């Protein structure tokens, strides 16, 4: 029925060009048909409608983001904020785009500006989580692998200060929503990588997995905290569960399991999982180093 639907949608668009229902119908038809560029052009055609329509700007920003056009995203976010300065999602989109472009201080500023328009504690918690994540990205900028390059990142002069701000932001987030599972997980994981406050990390990780249904990433964090606490047998059991649930076959999870097996003296199986991690894209130098040290 595609030809008939296409004819109907295009006919309606020509006959009722200013009807929002028709514009949305035609745009959604184009998107469903894989014609993203045409849908984008249609939305852009209506950005000057009076009164301006927020949803058209959101759609343009979403499609430009999907197409990975950061310059265009910035331009349309700027236009949207001029027209709708109180819309928190446009401020968040600005923060996400700046983060994607690795402009971390500017992203943090945009996220903080969005806090002024947040109306619920749940949203404030999410935003503070974004701020914490961005401070962490700034702290480890330039390091290819978060686990193995963490020690090298620590030696950077700004690392401690940036991570202090990261944890401070997470604390703000959890004051607004103590059950923000993503923040609990990230907070616990980064503490485990630094090897500090491990009992606190374990409490947060335990809460994160209690709040979610078999999330392999959160189980990985829990296993890693247990591993850092020296509870390797428990860590192995939890990591086995994480790997069984991980349909993406994350390289980090495979390598983590290899590290746990290595610590338990199961070198042969450890190397198997390290190699699996390598096949999934884990840094080759880090795998080589593990093999040589094994």
Positions of predicted regions on the chain:
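Alpha-solenoid helical repeat scaffolds
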Residues: 1-268, 274-294
């Amino acid at each position: 029925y595609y030809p008939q639907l296409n004819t109907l949608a295009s006919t309606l668009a020509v006959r009722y060009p200013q009807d929002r229902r028709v514009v949305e119908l035609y745009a959604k038809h184009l998107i469903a048909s894989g014609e993203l560029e045409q849908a984008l052009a249609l939305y852009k055609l209506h950005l000057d409608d009076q009164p301006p329509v927020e949803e058209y700007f959101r759609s343009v920003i979403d499609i430009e983001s999907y197409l990975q056009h950061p310059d265009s995203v910035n331009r349309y976010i700027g236009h949207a904020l001029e027209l709708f300065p109180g819309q928190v999602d446009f401020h968040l989109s600005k923060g996400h785009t700046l983060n994607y472009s690795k402009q971390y201080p500017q992203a943090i500023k945009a996220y903080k500006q969005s806090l002024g328009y947040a109306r619920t504690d749940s949203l404030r918690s999410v935003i503070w989580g974004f701020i914490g994540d961005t401070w962490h990205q700034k702290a480890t900028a330039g390091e290819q692998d978060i686990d193995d390059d963490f020690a090298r990142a620590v030696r950077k002069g700004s690392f401690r200060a940036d991570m202090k701000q990261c944890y401070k932001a997470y604390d703000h987030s959890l004051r607004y929503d103590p059950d923000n599972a993503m923040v609990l997980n990230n907070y616990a994981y980064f503490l485990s990588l630094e090897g500090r406050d491990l009992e606190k990390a374990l409490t947060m990780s335990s809460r994160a997995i209690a709040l979610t249904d078999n999330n392999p990433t959160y189980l990985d964090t829990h296993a890693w905290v247990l591993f850092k606490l020296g509870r390797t047998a428990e860590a192995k059991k939890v990591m086995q569960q994480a790997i069984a649930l991980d349909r993406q076959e994350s390289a980090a999870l495979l390598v983590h399991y290899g590290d746990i097996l290595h610590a338990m003296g199961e070198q042969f199986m450890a190397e198997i999982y390290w190699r699996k991690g390598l096949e999934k894209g884990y840094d080759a130098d880090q795998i080589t180093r593990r093999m040589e040290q094994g």
